Structure formats: structure tokens, C-alpha cells
Amino acid sequence: ILHSGQPLVLGAFTITPLASRHFQFPDPEMVATMLTDAEIPEPLVPPVSAFDYKLGEAWVLHVSHPKGSFLIVGSAGFIPGQLAGMDVDVVFLGVGGIGSQTADYRMQFWSETVGRISPERIIPIHWDSLTGPLDGPMTGEIRIAGFLSRGADETLAFLKARAAENSAVTLQTLPRFEEVILFP
């Protein structure tokens, strides 16, 4: 069981979970369906509707190791000031659905995540549909897929523009099915 702010030591790794906020869906129906009553009363046996799954809690994970540190911000939600002063080399930045948000929200999200931690590398995550085949393009035909990818061009342009403002930051995407070494 995770406790916000309580570090877990696993060998050379220290993992500190931080309770966070989930991305706020601008669509009231999606809020009601996915964020309200987030408990799943009994095990789900696929195939089931994507809306049978609930979002539950959102967490940020800070992982430190003698070779470097990284932060996993799984959702495009945030708690103002929460990440201030953290030492982070790489951030895995959850940006799913952020293209459907306002420009002000995107700027505030950037300021409260990347702006607070000043990482050397930003790796966007949680932006695909989560439903496409592993050997094909990551797309899907369900409603959530359309939502997550909505504004994808705008999201990518936003990330590139913000990263370009700071030459010390590199924006990188992960290759599929290839080993990635964060800290050589």
C-alpha cells in the first residue's frame, strides 16, 4: 500500500509516491462516468466496456538511484506547488487528453510539472489510445481513444515549443520494443 510522501527503498532505488490529481476531463459525461465512484465492485472479466474501468487515484512517482533520478507524472493533472524543489533528471510526462484542454491549463500544467523540476529530458507518456495492436499504430476506435488523441498535433506542438524555450531540456519519445538506458 502506498502512502503519499513515504519513500520505499528497493535495493539502490528509492521510490517516493505522491498522491496527485487526475487530468480533469472537460466533458461532464466522462467525469461522471470515469472519475465519480471510482470503485470497481467486482473483478472485471474482459471483454468489457472501457467505461467499466475506473480511474481511481492518480500518483506521481519520484525514483532516485545513484546514477540519476526520474519522475513519472502519469496523468496530466497536478497539485500546485507539489513538485517544487525536487531533484529530477528525466520526467515521464503524462499528456493524455491535454490537447483537449485550454491553452491556460496546458501552460499551468507545464509550469507545475516541468517548470518546478527543471529536468534535462522530457519523455511524453500516456498519450496514445492504449487500445491499438502492439505491432501496429497505437490507435483505437473507442471513445476514450478519440479523446486521448484529440488535439494530438496541438499537444506535440505545445511540448516542442516549451522545450525549445530552454536549450537545457531535450524532448524525447521512447522507441517501441527497444531497450532504453536512461543513465549510462
List where the protein language model places each region:
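Core dinuclear metal-dependent hydrolase active-site scaffold
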Residues: H3-G85, R176-P184
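Extracytoplasmic/secreted cell-surface and envelope-processing proteins
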Residues: S100-A103, G132-L134
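Active-site neighborhood of phospho(di)ester-bond hydrolases with catalytic His/Asp-centered motifs
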Residues: L71-A76, V91-G96, T102, R121-W127, ...
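Surface-exposed cleft-lining segments at the edges of enzyme active sites
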Residues: V45-A50, L93-G99
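A conditional alpha-helix N-cap/helix-loop micro-motif detector
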Residues: D52-K54, A103, A152
